[in-house]
Amino acid sequence: MTFPYYASAEQIMRDRSELARKGIARGRSVVILTYADGVLFVAENPSNTLRKTSEIYDRIGFAAVGKYNEFESLRKAGIQLADMRGYSYDRADVSGLSLANTYANALGGVFTEQPKPFEVELCVAEVARYGKPKPSQLYRISYDGSITDETRFLVMGGATEPIAAALKESYQPDLELGAAVAVAVGALATPADSGNGTAASPRVLTAGDLEVAILDRNRPRRAFRRLSAAALEELLPTTGESDAGDSGADGSPSGDSPDTSA
């Protein structure tokens, strides 16, 4: 007589958590931080089509790490929900907190009830309506539906500890856009611990390696805006110059550089 396979509920939840964390850790990191004029998204992402950041509604932005097909379906569902709520009631009734709670309920339900959890971690960011002094808000939603709020910065993806440590040292409230981009890119370039006791040198991230977007509170209606590679190079002239000097080339960095990240 064979006995059916048995695992305790605690073991099942541990296995699901481990699966989700491993999937998220395989993704390249994303930094989201507040600056003087809104919210800045900086993702290590050389792709020009598979985006990690997006607009959800007028004053609300979205960022994610993990399995692309899973967080892309969540992104589209969030846009549809926000559009429906704004159409049915009022555009002012669509808030980042309500959307974050909806995402948390959806991810928590999948984690508890389905055999496989979503291997994603999300951020919903919101800036105040034009002309209002309310501070910007960041909401992190984990694979198990847990939600936390932040008003300074957060890091998602693989090797978050050294990046978060670098941000704690360099981040200051109310930075200008150029300084905020420099802080975020510098933190993303922080190498992970090699494990052999020797300090690794910081990585070099060019404009072609990055996906950068902002929520600009000074824009009257739609706050979300992407920064092109050319605009990013202007914000980070030091990075462009050092990159050219290291390579010995006389051209500026491009999106065609090979991807050397893990």
From Swiss-Prot:
GO MF entries: threonine-type endopeptidase activity
CDD domains according to UniProt: Ntn_hydrolase
Regulation: The formation of the proteasomal ATPase ARC-20S proteasome complex, likely via the docking of the C-termini of ARC into the intersubunit pockets in the alpha-rings, may trigger opening of the gate for substrate entry. Interconversion between the open-gate and close-gate conformations leads to a dynamic regulation of the 20S proteasome proteolysis activity.
Segments passing through the bilayer: none
InterPro entries: Ntn_hydrolases_N, Proteasome_alpha-type, Proteasome_asu_bac, Proteasome_sua/b
Gene Ontology terms: biological process: modification-dependent protein catabolic process; proteasomal protein catabolic process
Coiled-coil ranges from the UniProt annotation: none
Subcellular locations according to the entry: Cytoplasm
Keyword Nucleotidyltransferase: no
Alphabetic keyword roster: Cytoplasm, Proteasome
Entry similarity comment: Belongs to the peptidase T1A family.
Subunit structure: The 20S proteasome core is composed of 14 alpha and 14 beta subunits that assemble into four stacked heptameric rings, resulting in a barrel-shaped structure. The two inner rings, each composed of seven catalytic beta subunits, are sandwiched by two outer rings, each composed of seven alpha subunits. The catalytic chamber with the active sites is on the inside of the barrel. Has a gated structure, the ends of the cylinder being occluded by the N-termini of the alpha-subunits. Is capped by the proteasome-associated ATPase, ARC.
Record NCBIfam families: 20S_bact_alpha
Protein's name according to its UniProt entry: Proteasome subunit alpha
Organism: Gordonia bronchialis (strain ATCC 25592 / DSM 43247 / BCRC 13721 / JCM 3198 / KCTC 3076 / NBRC 16047 / NCTC 10667)
Protein's gene: prcA
